[in-house]
């Protein structure tokens, strides 16, 4: 009994009434924020690392993994600096300013994961339109919540789905007990063959408190014996440091200027190895090398045709468009085991 009393005093375990009141404050927090501010432009930095833990020939049939499977390398890194245009609390346009990647041709790999880096924590859908946020009033019926309040003015909320579904997540969040503002949150789930853990640190005040300031995503893609691990990190709200004329540039020196934190030794090593291979390849001017390049380009073209979408506009002023889905699409594969 004494221990229970001490626990209640130290941790402020919430009653059902207190829990409902706190959740109500969290759900209502977006309405307490003035979003009538003028449109804004800010900048973001993204760094990612891909590791091929296991692979077989079937990985070649995944459209967004063709270049990784075909490259022969097991580790890839990349970074990007983007211009973000906002309207109220929504991102309306993202422009790539700088990028650097060891993925061949700077191709996008698992592009769906980028959507996880801009979660709409208070929205009805947390990520794009396929995962339901536990911090929206309309989704409360799908989740179970537990809360523990602390004397520092914060409360920890843990949540889990009432039923198993790939559209629901589990995790925890730290919120301001008085206002219901979410300070940090972690979401764990699985969707479309991707297991993920997403950690979010929210902005501090005003409209920025409705948006992530920093995100870290750990994800694993598993498909018929293949396993790709990835780590994505993003930082938002960075200042303007470059001229507006800079777009989609591959410039290491400029990235050194805008990068909000240094690369890890492991990232530096992968970049250095990639650049060393590129220098060696550029110095190889033999006929055999030219033949290898031609063969590689032919295989790249085959891969793009078989596994990538083909789209084209036609007519004056682009009045019509044509899109052909991949000839081989793993999402339509069937298998049993």
Segments predicted by a language model, with ranges:
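Gly/Pro-enriched, hydrophobic low-complexity segments
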Residues: 11-12, 147, 152-250
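Hydrophobic h-region of N-terminal signal peptides that target proteins for export
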Residues: 2-12
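Ordered hydrophobic segments in well-structured contexts
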Residues: 65-67, 78-85, 133, 142-147, ...
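Solvent-exposed N-terminal domain segments of exported/luminal and surface proteins
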Residues: 13-110, 262, 267-268, 275
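Flexible, membrane-facing loop/turn or short amphipathic-helix motifs
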Residues: 52-55, 186-191, 223-227, 328-335
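Flexible, processing/modification-adjacent segments and terminal tails
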Residues: 92-155, 159-170, 194
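Outer-membrane beta-barrel initiation region
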Residues: 121-149, 230, 246-337
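Generic beta-strand hydrophobic packing signal
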Residues: 36, 40, 185, 213-215, ...
